[in-house]
Amino acid sequence: MDIRLTGVTKRFKSVEALSRVDLHIRDGELFTLLGPSGCGKTTTLRLIAGFYVPNEGKIMFGDREVQEIPTSKRNIGMVFQNYALWPHMTVYRNVAYGLQFKKVPKSEWPRIVNEALTKVGLVGYETRYPGQLSGGQQQRVALARALALNPDVLLLDEPLSNLDAKIRGSVRAEIRKLQQSLGITTVYVTHDQEEALTLSDRIGIMCDGKLVQIGTPHDLYEKPSTRFVADFIGTNNLVAGTVEAVGEDII
């Protein structure tokens, strides 16, 4: 499923959080929205999810216009920053939670939950509660819950930010491997440059509610279009100096 945003603007009272954003996310790619706090990346994700309605512009899923369609009818899977697991429900019930709203027959739940837990390597954890799991395991339960819905689009809002730095790398690799094996269109939000450069097929860098550059990790690092992009992507991109002379082959 490819996603297109055309001229999308979002205001909160007098504040323009997103300004005329044009974006094409290709079918099956992992696209990361990267930028500092307050740049508009989470607002963009929430517009794609249907939590917000744009003041201007269009959002397309394939050939379907969705900006007025509720979240429940967009066939998305969402993993929140805090995982949003029900503490009083077992892993099984958490993963199956969305199936009741999609009116999936209860007889199908065991198979679907088992398939989702198999994908994230948590078969055997069905009867445990979130409080009995590590942070990485909770994150995988949240991912399994999203995948159980068989979504066309997977949305992840800073899913690793609550994890210990020691396990962040391994969970990041698991997410990438799973996304590639499923071939699902994935939109990932982070402020962490290393995460974005490691995970993504392409990255959109945001600043002050605008998309300032889109490209592969290599292109953004090697060919930043602005000083902001160069500075945000990596400290090695900027070299301070004074031009004293210009020759044919050297400066």
PLM regions and their residue ranges:
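The feature captures the beta-strand-to-loop junction immediately N-terminal to the Walker
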Residues: 34-36
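ABC ATPase nucleotide-binding domains
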Residues: 30, 71-77, 81, 85-231
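Helix-to-loop junction immediately C-terminal to a conserved catalytic motif
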Residues: 49
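Conserved coupling/switch loops of ABC nucleotide-binding domains, chiefly the family-specific signature
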Residues: 55-58, 108, 208, 240
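ATPase nucleotide-binding modules
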Residues: 225-251
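Conserved ABC transporter NBD signature motif
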Residues: 57-65
